[in-house]
Amino acid sequence: MCFEIEGAEVARRTLERFGMEAGAVDRSAIAIILHMQPGVTLSDGVEAVLLDRGTAIDVRGVDIELVERLRTTVTRTYPRGAFDRHFLRAIAREAAKRSDCQSHSFLHEGDLTGWMARSPWAAEATRT
């Protein structure tokens, strides 16, 4: 099972355990499943758009100017450390097992490693 599906199931169980309303649980699970798919729009739900855009900022540095004034404070409080290395290792493990997962196409057809290396966050990781 692809990690976005696994993550959605873990989130679903956790949110249900905390008593979240069923519709909100479903929207959260769908957002997690869709967050690595290209072309997420408001028709997919506000949660999906926010998670998609947040992931783009966090992993690739897309639209980093939206959080630029907070970046130093955030990385000082929550150092990224070896996040990039660990994240890429996890993606590579999944891609090696499951060529039908989105992680496989990001790693082998996209430029995930390059995106992350060029991200403004990469420079922060070297300072923490």
Describe the function of each predicted region:
Residues M20, Q37-T128:
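Divalent metal-dependent phosphate-bond-processing catalytic cores, especially two-metal-ion Mg2+/Mn2+ enzymes
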Residues M1-F3, H35-M36:
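Histidine-centered active-site/metal-ligand motif
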Residues G19-A31:
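Acidic/histidine metal-binding catalytic segments
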Residues I5, E9, R27-I30, D52:
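A broad detector of short, well-ordered amphipathic alpha-helices
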Residues C2-F18:
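An active-site-proximal "capping" alpha-helix that borders the catalytic cofactor pocket
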